[in-house]
Design a protein with these regions (language model features):
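A feature for loop-to-transmembrane-helix boundaries and adjacent hydrophobic helices
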Residues: 1-242
């Protein structure tokens, strides 16, 4: 809700219809959940091939943020085309709010004691100067042994907060249209690539190839490529404030 209200204020300021984002969310949220589940099932197909009915049991866990983002972005693109609104304009407006949602959402991993990293010492966690109530809850069972683990949820949450501040600063620069959105993709993907390397519950493509890291690299290359293309080849004059 906080992320929506934050985006809604900017959307109205930038000339979008007052009900535009609400209508978009009606479609984007369900599609994000569905695609997040599909992404997870594809990566974990061996767990579902014998019992396909388990695919619909989302309440048992098993969704992936990259799948959710892909589903949401594709839905938003189609929605914007139907409404005759620039997708990149909407993406620029909502990018900071996506980081707000992701930053808050990672605390769900803390509550569920999931998506954590590998083993570390308590002394290491104390050296990070994080509250004891977080440290105490990072004492979990890992491979049958109780140990302290990396609070990867916190790393990503803080990374997203920093990214939020950067994107809000970039708004004032009045970059070319789409560059705030592409900046979001680059920033989030860099953080996710390195944080993913610490996690113990990664989805794998093959062998030791973590899917989130592969997707992050592809996303960075795509975003950088789009910035270069729009600036130097397409030479667009559209700006964030247009």
């Amino acid at each position: 809700m906080l992320a929506y209200l934050f985006a809604q204020r900017e959307a109205v300021k930038r000339g979008l219809p007052e009900d535009f984002l609400a209508d978009l969310l009606i479609w984007a949220v369900p599609m994000a959940i569905i695609s997040a589940r599909i992404y997870y099932v594809i990566m974990k197909w061996e767990n579902y091939s014998d019992n396909p009915i388990d695919i619909i049991k989302v309440w048992e866990g098993g969704i992936a943020i990259h799948g959710a983002l892909i589903g949401a972005f594709v839905t938003a693109y189609i929605f914007c085309r139907i409404k005759g609104v620039s997708f990149l304009k909407v993406a620029d407006i909502t990018a900071p709010s996506i980081l707000i949602g992701q930053s808050i959402g990672r605390w769900g991993n803390f509550v569920n004691q999931e998506a954590h990293g590998g083993p570390v010492s308590r002394e290491f966690l104390e050296s990070l100067m994080i509250p004891n109530w977080i440290i105490d809850n990072m004492y979990v069972q890992l491979n049958g042994v109780m140990t302290y683990v990396h609070p990867t949820f916190l790393y990503e949450s803080l990374w997203n907060v920093i990214g939020l501040v950067i994107l809000l600063m970039l708004r004032k620069v009045n970059l070319k249209r789409g560059e705030i959105f592409f900046g979001y993709i680059i920033w989030y993907s860099i953080g996710r690539f390195f944080i993913e390397g610490l996690r113990t519950d990664s989805l794998y493509l093959i062998a030791e190839l973590r899917s989130a890291q592969v997707v992050s690299i592809i996303a960075i290359v795509f975003a950088v490529g789009m910035i270069i293309y729009r600036r130097f080849i397409q030479k667009t004059n559209e700006r964030y404030t247009d």
